[in-house]
Amino acid sequence: MRRIVATGTFDLLHPGHLFYLQESKKLGDELYVIVARDRNVKHKPRPIIPEEQRLQMVAALKPVDHALLGDTTDMFRPIEAIRPDVITLGFNQNFDPAVLTEALKARSLSAEVVRIGGYGDRVLCSSRRIVQRVIETRGPSLRVGQNTDPEDL
C-alpha cells in the first residue's frame, strides 16, 4: 500500500485545495492530510476558520482517506507515525523539496517529495483572493454588530 501525505492550512477551502488533494491521491493508495494547527501558521495571516473546522472539512473531501491535525511542536512527528512513501507539496507551499528531503533523511524517513502543480489561472483559487473579493464586493455591508441578512453574505 502506497501512502501519500499532503499538508496545508486549508483555510477557506477552494478548488485549488481540492485539485492539490486529487493530484496527491493519484500518486498512491492512501491519502493522509495533515492540517496545520492555528498556532503553527506563521508564514501568512492566521487562519480565519478554526483548526477543528478546517480538519472536519478536509476529512469530508472524497480523495482524503485520513485527516489529522499537525503536531504543535514538531512538524515531523505525524510523518514519522505515518511513514509515507510520498509527501506532496502544493505549488505555492514555502518548502524547498531538497531541504525537506534532507530533513526527512536525518530522521530515517525516505519519502519522495513531489511538488503538485497549480490549478491553472482561476480567479478564486487562493484563500487570500477569496478574502479580498469578499472585502471588495461585500465590505461596506459587513460591519461588526450590524444585523445583516445571511442571504446578503
From Swiss-Prot:
Which UniProt keywords are given for this protein, alphabetically ordered?
A: ATP-binding, FAD, Flavoprotein, FMN, Nucleotide-binding, Nucleotidyltransferase, Transferase
Q: Provide a GO biological process annotation.
A: FMN metabolic process
Give the residues the record marks as binding ATP.
T9, F10, H14, P15, G16, H17, N92, Y119
Q: Which cofactor does it need?
A: a divalent metal cation
InterPro entries assigned to the protein according to its UniProt record, in alphabetical order? Archaeal_FAD_synthase, Cyt_trans-like, FAD_synth_RibL, Rossmann-like_a/b/a_fold
Q: Which Gene3D superfamilies match?
A: HUPs
The record's EC number reads 2.7.7.2
Asked whether the UniProt record includes Nucleotidyltransferase among its keywords, one would answer yes
Annotated pathway: Cofactor biosynthesis; FAD biosynthesis; FAD from FMN: step 1/1
Q: Which reaction does it catalyse?
A: FMN + ATP + H(+) = FAD + diphosphate
Q: Name one GO molecular function term.
A: ATP binding
User: What do we know about how this protein assembles, alone or with others?
Assistant: Homodimer.
Give the record's family classification: Belongs to the archaeal FAD synthase family.
Q: Tell me, in a sentence or two, what this protein's role is.
A: Catalyzes the transfer of the AMP portion of ATP to flavin mononucleotide (FMN) to produce flavin adenine dinucleotide (FAD) coenzyme.
Which PANTHER family does this chain map to?
A: FAD SYNTHASE
Q: What is this protein called?
A: FAD synthase
Q: Which organism is it from?
A: Methanosphaerula palustris (strain ATCC BAA-1556 / DSM 19958 / E1-9c)
User: Mind giving the lineage of the organism this protein is from?
Assistant: Archaea, Methanobacteriati, Methanobacteriota, Stenosarchaea group, Methanomicrobia
